[in-house]
Amino acid sequence: MKRSTERILVTHAGSLPRPEDLWEMLIAKSNDRPYDREIFARRLRSAVAEVVKKQIDCGIDIVNDGEFGKHSFSDYARERLGGYVERAPDPDERPPAIFGRDLVDFPEYFNSKGGRAVVGRHALRFFCNVPIKYIGHAAVKTDIENFTAALQGVKVEEAFLPAVAPGTIEHRLKNEYYPNDEAYVYALADAMHEEYKAIVDAGFILQIDDPDLADGWQLNSHMSVSEYRKFAELRIDALNHALSDIPQERVRFHMCWGSYHGPHKYDIPLRDIVDLILKVRAESYSIEASNPRHEHEWRVWEEVKLPEGKVLVPGVAGHYSDFIEHPEAIAERLVKYAKLVGRENVMAGTDCGLGTRVGHPKITWAKFEAMAEGARLATKQLWGR
C-alpha cells in the first residue's frame, strides 16, 4: 500500500455520483422493473471509465470505480449473498434506526417532512431463513473487469474497490436461521471472504466499509458502552476471520457514524471504540473526522498511538453539507494529524461516500479539488516544498 512518503496523498471513501441514465437503470434493476441488460452493461463500463478520469482530473491519487454497479447497501448484499427472503415486518415492528438514541430527543425532527432522515415503519425487509452462501461471483467479476478496463492508459498511485463488512450486512439482513449472533456473523464472514479475496487477487486494494462499528451504538440504544464494546468486538473478530488469509497491506478499513443527515448528538465517541478500530486486520484506517460532531476528535491521537506501519485517513471533506471546504482548512486538518502520527502516515480522505449525499455532482468534484489543493498546501508546510 502506498504511503505519503513525499507528499500527502489524496483519496476518498467510495461512493460517487452516478450519471442520471445509469442511476435510472440501477433503480429499475433494484425494483425488478424491465431494463435493457446489454445497454446497462455497456453504460456501466463507460461510466466507470468516465468517473476514473474525473477523479484523476480532480487530483485524487487513489481512485475507485465510484461503486457505480451498486444501488444501495441492501441491494448490494442481496445481490452478493443467497439465503434471504424479502417480506414486510410485523405491523407493530419498527426496525431499529441508526439514529435510535437521537430519536428520543428529537422525535419531531425525525417524524417531520423537513427531517432528512425519516422514521420508517412498514418498508420491506430481508430475513435470513436458510444457510448463507456467496452468489456474487458474476457481480464482483463485472466490477473488477470494468475497473480494470477503466485504468488502462491512465496513471494513478493506487486503486481500490469497496466491499461491506459482515457486521454492516447484519444490520440490514436479519437472522431467522442461525442459533445466535456469533454463528450468523461468522457465516456472513465466511461468505464475504470470497468477495474480499477476489478483489485482492485482482490486484486492487480492498476497502472494508463498516459503518456498523459506530452506528450500531444508535441501533442498539439500550446498551451501555461496555455492552456495546462486547457487541462490536464480536463483529470485528468475525471480520478479521474473513480477512485472515488476506495481506494486511492490501486492506483499508472505513468507518463512519452512519452518514444520515441529522443531529448525531448521541454518536458514540471515537475514544470509546478507537482501540477496536485498530484491531481490524488492515493497514489504513479511514475515519469520519471533518463534521461538527467529530472534528475535535483529532485530539484522540494525542493519547492513542497509531501502531507502527499503519496509515490514518481522516475525513477532511464532509458529506453532511454542500459547503465546499476551504483548502486552507483542509490543510490545517491534515497538518494536525501529521504532527501527531507522522506525515508519511496520513492521507486526505472524505468522511464517507459523497455519491448520493451532496446536492449535485459538481459539489463532489469541487470538494475533491479543494482536498487536492489542501493536500498541496499541507505538503508545503510539512516538507517545506
Outline where the language-model segments fall:
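Domain-level signal for soluble alpha/beta catalytic cores
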Residues: 1-385
